[in-house]
Amino acid sequence: QCTENGCIFSDDAVNAFVAKAKEADGYIFGTPVYYAHPSGRIQSFLDRVFYSSGKHFAHKPGASVAVARRGGTALNKYFGITQMITVGSTYWNQVHGRNAEDAAKDLEGMQTMRNLGHNMAWVLKCLEAGKEKGLVPPTADRSNQTNFIR
């Protein structure tokens, strides 16, 4: 039911997000990291978003940003399973700091964020140029799918 009609709660933030996300050209999701994983809040939210509406993200660029050092890359898994284009940078898309002032002092992390922004802009321009030339995304073969048990 969720994949056909969206989430069943009419006032659900997932439905509101998906309505806006359908119109977006690309996405950057950010999260703090706890125990080497994204926060449970964003992971639960994105589980529901991508399970109910993953088809709306196909062939669009996405990136995730983690506030930590060397952890939190699980958000990138959503991009692969929905045929998104994963945008990278010059290092893992992470910055370290307990608050905005601390993060601003992470020179390598801030450099990585700037490069991520430049790369995202470039990918979006490439996609637009492809559309102007008549290029269309490939159609996925979905003839063989394993259920959640196997």
Specify the residue positions occupied by each region the protein language model found:
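Glycine-rich phosphate/pyrophosphate-binding loop and the adjoining helix
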Residues: S10, I85-R150
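Short, flexible, mixed-charge acidic loops at enzyme active sites
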Residues: Q1
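Helix-loop-strand module that forms the ligand-binding subsite of alpha/beta enzymes
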Residues: E4-N93
